[in-house]
Amino acid sequence: MDIIREIESEMLRKDIPDFKPGDTVRVYFKVIEGGRERVQAFEGLVIKRRGKGLSETFTVRRISYGIGVERVFPLHSPRLEKIEVIRRGKVRRAKLYYIREKIGKAAKIKELVQQPDKENNNTEETNA
């Protein structure tokens, strides 16, 4: 079993940003059409992450011309060019399947507001 883990650890990508369900991401994925290869961007809401190691995947959902489109991406795929986190969402679930039934504003996720560090604020106030 340790041999398998060693081989898997070599194949794991290190350039993946930290993102969770509820975040809006833009995924750049290499698409091969005929003999050509191009990069296609897919932007949407992360509704789930599953698995561990090489088999880890995440599902991104977006609305395209009024129709919901979901795409499952393998996290450590060599065809995955890069992932950009557009905005962080504030959710209390790991799987956001309920978003599939929501339409319009009801499907919006609240944005997570980053709190400033308390340590930095205390030092600024005492210095001023």
Curated annotation (Swiss-Prot):
It comes from the Bacteria. Keywords: Ribonucleoprotein, Ribosomal protein. GO terms for molecular function: structural constituent of ribosome. The keyword Ribosomal protein applies. One of its GO terms (biological process) is translation. One of its GO terms (cellular component) is cytosolic large ribosomal subunit. Belongs to the bacterial ribosomal protein bL19 family. NCBIfam families: rplS_bact. This protein is located at the 30S-50S ribosomal subunit interface and may play a role in the structure and function of the aminoacyl-tRNA binding site. This is Large ribosomal subunit protein bL19. The lineage of its organism: Bacteria, Bacillati, Bacillota, Bacillota incertae sedis, Caldicellulosiruptorales.
